[in-house]
UniProtKB/Swiss-Prot annotation:
GO biological process, one term: response to wounding
Keyword Membrane among record annotations: no
Family according to the record: Belongs to the protein kinase superfamily. CMGC Ser/Thr protein kinase family. MAP kinase subfamily.
GO molecular function: ATP binding; MAP kinase activity; protein kinase activity; protein serine kinase activity
PTM per Swiss-Prot/TrEMBL: Dually phosphorylated on Thr-191 and Tyr-193, which activates the enzyme. Phosphorylated on Ser residue.
Domain Protein kinase: 32-319
Name listed for the protein in its UniProt record: Mitogen-activated protein kinase 2
Enzyme class label: transferase
Length: 376
């Protein structure tokens, strides 16, 4: 539970109160009443809370020492920029970014999201029975959210069960946009690509220069297979083993299906693998719906140019009972959203831009802290 504590050094900042959860200090706006910690990651701790002004339940993520690691700081900035613009019922909503007290010295960032009950990873590994209706509805919502994200020219690049939040009535929302990129920037953002290997598309494993929205479709296929089988379909131990597992199930590929590989060394490796006849998905998932298997086969295709698109997947007969094209308008997002250019930023500019994001949620602070806020 959340334990009230005195502020550090006995100095209480205006509009803040202080709590300890899992040995972590939370300095949060007084309108939020923390309940209990609900998650922990490399970034810090997440707690559930209530906004006493709106009576809404929210999740507060504290990112500790955000500037300690430049890559983590960039991920946080990217999340802030994107979620301020993305508005869709299958994308987690960022409700607030708490205003830091001092622009030049703040170290921690507090993000306030809508509260969800669990994530798809927890559901898959639980004993909860997953019917065809469950699998169909989860997949539909994932594809629907992804269609919206792609319509904003954004690649998520880190789709996995743990990044899909779920609540008790099976509503699903995509979260964690720290690795997202715009899809009109090609072949220049591999530097910190650390997406979970098991869900990584072949074109990324094979170090191809050009890739697009189909990388997210591959990840969706891996997640769908995991829903059907209750375990990862390609649980590789390292990169080469990951490729080997993929070929083992998909089968050895024809020459024309390897033309997308523009890395000669990677192509030679694929061609050197022993012949595999492949394993049919209907054999791997004998209890699955026939249409589900057909859609899965179209998602998990090695050549990205032959992989089904998100829109085509939503129009597939397996999704037909749920999909209404008129209910899926494209995202209204600025086309110059510059999340890719951030990689060259220095620490002070990252700090400046984070402060700017806070100001979007607290415009009154721009005048109150007039002496600290530069013109944007």
């Amino acid at each position: 539970m959340a334990t009230p504590v005195d502020p550090p050094n006995g100095i209480r900042n205006q509009g803040k109160h202080y709590f300890s959860m899992w040995q972590t200090l939370f300095e949060i706006d007084t309108k939020y009443v923390p309940i209990k910690p609900i998650g922990r990651g490399a970034y810090g701790v997440v707690c559930s809370s209530v906004n006493r002004e709106s009576n809404e339940r929210v999740a507060i993520k504290k990112i500790h020492n955000v500037f300690e690691n430049r890559i983590d700081a960039l991920r946080t900035l990217r999340e802030l920029k994107l979620l301020r613009h993305l508005r869709h019922e299958n994308v987690v909503a960022l409700k607030d970014v708490m205003m830091a007290n001092h622009k030049r010295s703040f170290k921690d960032v507090y993000l306030v999201y809508e509260l969800m009950d669990t994530d798809l990873h927890q559901i898959i590994k639980s004993s909860q029975v997953l019917s065809n209706d469950h699998c169909q509805y989860f997949l539909f919502q994932l594809l629907r959210g992804l269609k919206y994200i792609h319509s904003a020219n954004i690649l998520h690049r880190d789709l996995k069960p743990g990044n899909l939040l779920v609540n008790a009535n099976c509503d699903l929302k995509i979260c964690d946009f720290g690795l997202a990129r715009t899809s009109n920037t090609k072949g220049q953002f591999m530097t910190e690509y650390v997406v979970t290997r098991w869900y990584r598309a072949p074109e990324l494993l094979l170090c191809c220069d050009n890739y697009g929205t189909s990388i997210d479709v591959w990840s969706v296929g891996c997640i769908f297979a995991e829903l059907l089988g209750r375990k990862p379909v390609f649980p590789g131990t390292e990169c080469l083993n990951q490729i080997k597992l993929i070929i083992n199930i998909l089968g050895s590929q024809r020459e024309e299906d390897l033309e997308f590989i523009d890395n000669p060394k990677a192509k030679r490796y694929i061609e050197s693998l022993p012949y595999s006849p492949g394993i049919s998905f209907s054999r791997l998932y004998p209890g699955a719906n026939v249409l589900a298997i057909d859609l899965l086969q179209k998602m998990l295709v090695l050549d990205p140019s032959k992989r089904i698109s998100v829109t085509e997947a939503l129009q597939h007969p397996y999704m037909a009972p749920l999909y209404d094209p008129s209910a899926n308008p494209p995202a209204q997002v600025p086309i110059d959203l510059d999340v890719d250019e951030d990689e060259d930023l220095g620490a002070e500019m990252i700090r400046e831009l984070m402060w700017k994001e806070m100001i979007h949620y607290h415009p009154e602070a721009a005048t109150i802290n007039n002496n600290e806020v530069s013109e944007f």
